[in-house]
Regions:
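His/Asp/Glu-rich, glycine-adjacent segments
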Residues: 89-269
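A short beta-strand-to-alpha-helix junction
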Residues: 107-112, 279-283, 333-347, 358-373, ...
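A long, amphipathic alpha-helix that forms part
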Residues: 26-28, 33, 44-46, 216-242, ...
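Bacterial N-terminal signal peptides
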Residues: 7-19
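Histidine-centered active-site microenvironments of extracellular/periplasmic hydrolases
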Residues: 301, 305-352, 406-407
């Protein structure tokens, strides 16, 4: 009698449990994705450091995921490429074609296509953006946004890279929501939003050692501040989707490119002052990546991307007195790149996470900057908008099916 009664009670409990189980499945947590951008990082340059064991954190990502070269756009520069990654559309379609557009510094008001953070926000995904180029002024998201490169501050000229502190921002908002600015100033400090631009040739002559060492010290300070910002938002403002960018490698790489035969502007007075600076920038980034990896568990997707590879810029400054000017020779820009063809300077792509193949090398140009947004949407089970020109990097997944269909 007791056993029959127990069996009946158990059956009743099971019946009650069935809808609860179904309810639990319908509220399955959204995937967590962390994208780490690095300005100007090239896979071929990283290989010697990886073989020497000097990039242990990046090596961990490679062992546990997929990696390869990342095809970029023609005439690649940071705002042009990052906005292509955000939208998976051509620069002429999304509107941000360079540092200057119509004589005005590139900004989010120029966007003609919907960026990834807007699509995710509308689909209920919480979003965090920190120090990402071409995100000034910040836009409303389902989370937070802290702008990056091309944020305008006091004494910033149109089109010129400058490093305003958070308290010095002018002409728009650098933080969304606005009240988060005071929180960051209190807990992270009055950090530099972007990395210091390269010194001009005229500032170097006769003072190479002093100027270079002072500049590199400033670069390291900014890198440490950016790391503190990343650690703070990942700890105190966790989101389903986070995109953060480390920007210092681009400046150091362009300016201190050490390989004499490939650097028309090679100057031994500059390169011999700090021969460690070029490889050290990637070693320092690996330490930044180590901090980020503390926030990445086995259920998190980590994607590391660079907008383009690296080539020297200083040669133009040495040979062309108007290298920092536009065609009217009135508006300063940062410099002219020596690579109109993006395939000359491919970026790099690394990804690991649930269902991503391990130790998979993508050969040739299987991955493109156009593919980043579609692949992120795929992870969240969100359909790819018609205007996007990229495709899902299905080859990196063990299964081609959408990871999770969002409950709406």
């Amino acid at each position: 009698m007791v056993s029959q009664r127990s069996a009946m009670i158990f059956a009743i409990l099971c019946l009650f449990a069935l809808p609860l189980a179904g309810q639990h499945q319908s509220t399955k947590p959204k995937p967590r994705v962390v994208v780490v951008g690095v300005n100007g990082m090239e896979l071929d340059i990283l290989r010697p450091l990886l073989l020497q064991g000097q990039l242990p954190n990046l090596a961990k990502v490679i062992r546990n995921g997929a990696y390869g070269k990342l095809r970029t756009v023609s005439a690649p520069n940071c705002p042009r490429v990052y906005t292509t990654m955000f939208t998976s559309t051509r620069p002429e379609e999304h509107g941000v074609t360079g540092f200057l557009v119509g004589g005005i510094t590139a900004n989010t008001n120029m966007l003609k296509e919907e960026p990834i953070w807007s699509i995710l926000s509308k689909n209920g995904v919480t979003v965090g953006m920190a120090n990402v180029p071409a995100t000034f002024p910040v836009m409303p998201v389902n989370g937070y946004m802290v702008s990056g490169m091309l944020t305008r501050g006091k004494s910033c000229e149109d089109g010129v890279l400058c490093a305003p502190k958070l308290s010095e921002v002018e002409g728009g908002d650098a933080v969304y929501p606005k009240e988060m600015k005071a929180e960051l100033l209190k807990n992270v400090g009055d950090f530099y939003i972007d990395c210091e631009r390269m010194p001009a040739a005229a500032d170097l002559k006769g003072h190479e050692s002093e100027v270079i060492n002072k500049w590199l010290d400033k670069v390291q300070l900014i890198r440490e501040q950016q790391t503190k910002l990343f650690d703070y938002v990942l700890t105190n403002h966790p989101t389903d989707f986070t995109w953060i960018v480390q920007s210092c490698e681009d400046r150091t790489g362009h300016w201190l490119y050490p390989i004499a035969p490939f650097n028309v502007g090679y100057n031994p007075k500059i390169e011999t002052v700090r021969p460690d600076a070029f490889p050290d920038q990637y070693i320092q980034f690996d330490k930044v990546l180590g901090t980020i990896l503390k926030h990445v568990d086995e259920n998190t997707y980590l994607i590391v991307v660079s907008d383009h590879g690296i080539k020297p810029l200083r040669e133009f400054e040495e040979t062309d007195p108007h290298a920092h000017m536009d065609h009217e020779k009135t508006t300063p820009v940062i410099a002219k790149h020596d690579f109109a063809d993006g395939d000359d300077v491919p970026g790099a792509f690394f990804a690991m996470g649930p269902g991503i193949k391990r130790d998979l090398r993508l050969m040739g140009f299987e991955a493109s900057v156009y593919d980043i947004a579609p692949t992120i949407l795929h992870i969240y089970g969100i359909g790819q908008p018609e205007q996007m020109r990229g495709h899902v990097l299905s080859e990196i997944f063990e299964s081609s099916e959408n990871k999770v269909a969002l409950q709406k």
